Curated annotation (Swiss-Prot):
Organism: Shigella boydii serotype 18 (strain CDC 3083-94 / BS512)
Official protein name in the record: Protein nucleotidyltransferase YdiU
Binding site for ATP: 84, 86-87, 107, 119-120, 170, 177, 256
UniProt record similarity statement: Belongs to the SELO family.
Enzyme Commission code: 2.7.7.-, 2.7.7.108
Function of the molecule: Nucleotidyltransferase involved in the post-translational modification of proteins. It can catalyze the addition of adenosine monophosphate (AMP) or uridine monophosphate (UMP) to a protein, resulting in modifications known as AMPylation and UMPylation.
Catalysed transformations (reactions): L-seryl-[protein] + ATP = 3-O-(5'-adenylyl)-L-seryl-[protein] + diphosphate; L-threonyl-[protein] + ATP = 3-O-(5'-adenylyl)-L-threonyl-[protein] + diphosphate; L-tyrosyl-[protein] + ATP = O-(5'-adenylyl)-L-tyrosyl-[protein] + diphosphate; L-histidyl-[protein] + UTP = N(tele)-(5'-uridylyl)-L-histidyl-[protein] + diphosphate
Length: 478
């Protein structure tokens, strides 16, 4: 089957990019590809059998027209000016059978005009982390970019030490970022901001294109998508680590996996990025930061959208987030209805978990085994203060009984939303260390496991992290 590519970005958004081709690596070789995603995108298996090829920037497919996008942004709350694709190149937009498109974005593809002080490269470590994280999030049901392939090489790339240079093929319906809009707003080119908005509506909100109120309705949906995404992050214990405005997806996707982390111990103030000295992007601050970022996006639209309409949309953020978060947390607790004591029960559990540094994922997974008429629970052994747990657990079981639902039905629901497996940093690190020695088996094993996060397992993928795996420091160097 021949793949079809279109050039909408190149044709419709002049002055938002620089056309250029990838710079191949030395002795590049394909070490992993996403068979399931490739099948979904109707990519012929033969493309993965001819060396690095398109996956390593050594060839282009017919119809591809590679370019690097320009955007700007606020980083750690400070205006950073022009940024852009410093090491990534949009190879093309694949036209799918249903008329939608999928960006093929090659990360680590070499220098671009937007590389600033960088070398345009990515390392094997970071490409593995992004591939694992984006696929883990996808199978958890959270909107995200996807990873299609990883290429490694003999080209050394220098970060804290010399590391193998690599490339990641990332795919997404769009790479539109808040930062695209900021770039032209701060250059006082509001007409180009409007062009970006029209492009987004035309291709991703086409049902609004002929509506005279299209900009307000569109921005309201961007707010809602963002609120929903953040609610989902919070419920699975995901910390992004670097929520700069240039890393915010207009479509509400999880974008740009850098120093991310999933909670091990329940620590509301968890900081996964060791460069985040003030804790701006701590786990519990993510909802507030996302709203701040939406406010920056709203500012860029103010030349052609009424400020009252923008503020009305922004005012809806908290309610949308709390609604999604509340629904998801009730499911995690096994509540079939909404009762006034639910928030108190959840907050008391969180307080108990924070005091005891309980494992976030294991606690909710073990809670899924609760029998409403039995005081016995394997979760009890996870707590030192048994009296405090017993007191909470008795009230929790009383709440379950109000719903008049069988244990089996409730447990099935809870186990479908409380994963047994999340991508803990130590699991990623183990796969990385093996891969850097040339052994890709653990990378493939872990990818396979992450496809079934809600299935029970009896291996170390679902155990507490070992001592060496706790508090692994992760930075933006990738």
């Amino acid at each position: 089957m021949t793949l079809s590519f279109v050039t909408r970005w190149r044709d419709e958004l002049p002055e938002t990019y620089t056309a250029l081709s990838p710079t191949p690596l030395n002795n590049a070789r394909l070490v992993w590809h996403n068979t399931e995603l490739a099948n979904t995108l109707s990519i012929p298996s033969s493309l993965f059998k001819n060396g690095a090829g398109v996956w390593g920037g050594e060839a282009l497919l017919p119809g591809m027209s590679p370019l690097a996008q320009v955007y700007s942004g606020h980083q750690f709350g400070v205006w950073a000016g022009q940024l852009g694709d410093g090491r990534g190149i949009l190879l093309g937009e694949q036209l799918l059978a249903d008329g939608t498109t999928m960006d093929w974005h090659l990360k680590g593809a070499g220098l671009t005009p937007y590389s600033r002080m960088g070398d345009g490269r990515a390392v094997l470590r970071s490409t593995i982390r992004e591939s694992l994280a984006s696929e883990a999030m996808h199978y958890l049901g959270i909107p995200t970019t996807r990873a299609l392939s990883i290429v490694t090489s003999d080209s050394p790339v220098y970060r804290e030490t010399a590391e193998p240079g690599a490339m990641l093929m990332r795919v997404a319906p769009s790479h539109l970022r808040f930062g695209h809009f900021e770039h032209f707003y701060y250059r006082r080119e509001s007409e180009k901001v409007r062009q970006l908005a029209d492009f987004a509506i035309r291709h991703y909100w086409s049902h609004l294109e002929d509506d005279e109120d299209k900009y307000r309705l569109w921005f309201s949906d961007v707010v809602a998508r963002t609120a929903s995404l953040i609610a989902q992050w919070q419920t699975v214990g995901f910390a992004h680590g670097v929520m700069n405005t240039d890393n915010m997806s207009l479509l509400g996707l999880t974008l740009d996996y850098g120093p991310f982390g999933f909670l091990d111990d329940y620590e509301p103030g968890f900081i996964c990025n060791h460069s985040d000295h003030q804790g701006r992007y701590s786990f519990d601050n993510q909802p507030a930061v996302a709203l701040w970022n939406l406010q920056r996006l709203a500012q860029t639209l103010s030349p052609f959208v009424a400020v009252d309409a923008l503020n009305e949309a922004l005012d809806s953020y908290q309610q949308v987030l709390l609604t999604h978060y509340g629904q998801r947390m009730r499911q995690k607790l096994g509540f079939m209805t909404e009762q006034k004591e639910d928030n108190a029960l959840l907050n008391e559990l969180f307080s108990l978990m924070a005091r005891e540094r309980s494992d976030y994922t294991r606690t909710f997974r073990m809670l899924s085994l609760t029998e409403q008429h039995s005081a016995a629970s394997p979760l009890r052994d996870e707590f030192i203060d048994r009296a405090a747990f017993d007191d909470w657990f008795a009230r929790y079981r009383g709440r379950l009984q109000q719903d008049e639902v069988s244990d089996s039905e409730r447990q099935q629901l809870m186990q479908s939303v409380n994963p047994a497996l999340v991508l803990r940093n130590w699991l990623a690190q183990r796969a990385i260390e093996a891969a850097e020695k040339g052994d890709m088996m653990e990378l493939h094993r872990l990818h396979e496991a992450l496809r079934n996060p809600f299935s029970d397992r009896d291996d170390d993928y679902v155990s507490r992290p070992p001592d060496w795996g706790k508090r692994l420091e992760v930075s933006c160097s990738s």
